[in-house]
């Protein structure tokens, strides 16, 4: 009996130790991010007016969920840091409203959200429908557009591939990637499959429902696993589509001016690189060692 109790106690200790290790690992991933968020020095309790931001948290490292957290704090990523910074500069209480990517645009168009901040690129169609902010730069990996696929199919997607006949290529509905597939791959025989949620699309890729998925390179890095890999196929991307923008309602010209001022201030302060690197670590795209951060979330300089 004592032997059984000893074994049971040992098992409990092992499970407890594993849980503690997992918790510590999760906390270590967020150190640089938490430091960047704290540096913004934003206290929502100071403000009365609310800034509602539509966001689609399925696009790591730009925006994604940390399931260990609750409420608005569970939504993390580069665009969350940016939204927090903008809210502070505007003197407003930030409210994140999570929804699908295309619903973000509908929310702004209908006036149900003040801003849509969710890795949006400039497109001619969006310029007709919304007021569009100045660019913000979320790392070079967000300007490159790529196909991800499975290990078994990787050899099919070479950098100079010209025949996509019979291949199903996924993209998020309403995204720049949808536009690129329509313009560059459908004429070469590809069949476009649209998804509301990029994580659902990644599952469809892993299970063989589609042959490849069009994503921003940085997002592709976050989706890589034992099954999914980055392919060698890159889209040709016009300069006008590079970098990101914030979408506003056509009637909000005064708000646009304030948002652009906040973006200019963030750019001048050199915040974007720091934010993006912190989010790469958080999303496990890169390690702290790879990017040169210590255990306290500080950038190591020589």
Show which residues each predicted segment covers.
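Ligand-binding clefts/hinges and TM-proximal coupling segments of bilobed small-molecule sensing domains
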Residues: 26-32, 43, 174-193, 233-234, ...
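Short helix-initiation/N-cap motifs at beta->coil->alpha
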Residues: 78, 95-107, 156, 192-207, ...
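Extended ligand-binding regions for polar small-molecule ligands
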Residues: 25-31, 80-89, 151-155, 167-168, ...
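Bilobed "Venus flytrap"/periplasmic-binding protein-like clamshell domains
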Residues: 57-60, 72-88, 120, 142-198, ...
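A ligand-binding cleft/hinge motif common to bilobed small-molecule-binding domains
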Residues: 103, 119-129, 182-184, 204-207, ...
């Amino acid at each position: 009996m004592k032997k059984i109790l000893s074994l049971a106690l040992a098992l409990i200790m092992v499970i407890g130790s594993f849980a503690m290790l997992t918790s510590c690992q999760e906390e270590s991933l967020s150190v640089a991010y938490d430091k960047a968020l704290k540096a913004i020095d934003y206290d929502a309790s100071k403000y009365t007016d609310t800034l509602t931001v539509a966001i689609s948290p399925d696009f790591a490292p730009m925006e994604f969920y940390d399931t260990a957290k609750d409420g608005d704090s569970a939504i993390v990523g580069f665009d969350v840091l940016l939204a927090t910074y903008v809210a502070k500069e505007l003197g407003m209480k930030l409210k994140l409203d999570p929804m699908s990517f295309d619903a973000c645009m509908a929310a702004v168009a209908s006036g149900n959200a003040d801003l849509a901040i969710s890795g949006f690129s400039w497109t001619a169609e969006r310029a007709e429908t919304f007021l569009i902010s100045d660019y913000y730069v979320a790392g070079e990996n967000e300007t490159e557009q790529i196909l991800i696929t499975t290990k078994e199919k990787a050899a099919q997607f070479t950098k100079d591939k010209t025949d996509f006949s019979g291949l199903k290529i996924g993209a998020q509905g309403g995204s720049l990637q949808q536009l690129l597939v329509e313009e560059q791959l459908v004429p070469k025989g590809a069949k476009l499959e649209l998804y509301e949620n990029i994580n659902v699309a990644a599952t469809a890729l892993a299970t063989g429902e589609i042959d490849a998925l069009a994503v921003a390179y940085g997002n592709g890095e976050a989706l890589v696993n034992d099954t999914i890999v980055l392919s060698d196929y890159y889209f040709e991307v016009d300069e006008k589509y590079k970098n990101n923008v914030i979408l506003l309602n056509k009637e909000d010209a005064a708000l646009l001016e304030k948002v652009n001022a906040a973006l200019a201030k963030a750019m001048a302060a050199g915040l974007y690189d720091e934010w993006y690197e912190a989010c790469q670590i958080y999303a496990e795209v890169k390690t702290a060692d790879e990017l040169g951060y210590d255990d306290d979330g500080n950038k190591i300089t020589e």
